[in-house]
Amino acid sequence: MSRTAPSSLAPGQDLPDDVAYLLQRAVSGVLRAAQNGDLPLFAWTLGLPQDELLEVLAKLFPEVEPVEPLRDVQYQQLLALKPRDFQSMLRLLEQSRNPQLPERKIRWLAHAMTAACYGEHELWRDMGLGDMTDLARLMQVCFPPLYERQRIGQNWKQLLLSRLHDG
């Protein structure tokens, strides 16, 4: 029996409301954790170029005043703190993305999720989600091939790290 929910989305359609909400929670959770020192400082960038991070903030949190950009040299110093395997982990997620969903928003989620992988807690906690069912919902809808590979009792960080080191 397949664990993947049947898709009712047409290609390019926006995210389901619950997934859009969880994307906002994940991005804000990772940014908050980085600012509080619970994630490495690079996570505050989500590993994105500064103009794209500012776009993420404007699109996901339109009620918030526009964020003043850092000087480029400061932002580049933060990005330089990314772990060496960040891009490989990110690629694993992006290659598993649901092609029916908006590519840009799933890219943002993949960046937030990858940054959260460098925290010390379970992935859902490091992403600022309510519980592991929130993360399972994101994985099921946004990264179905990875959702299918998760074994009962295996946490999501274990799955991602094992896939990274196997591939």
Features from the language model and the residues they span:
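Hydrophobic, aromatic-lined core segments that form the binding pocket/scaffold
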Residues: S2-L160
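Cysteine-cluster motifs in flexible loop/terminal segments that predominantly coordinate metals
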Residues: S162-G167
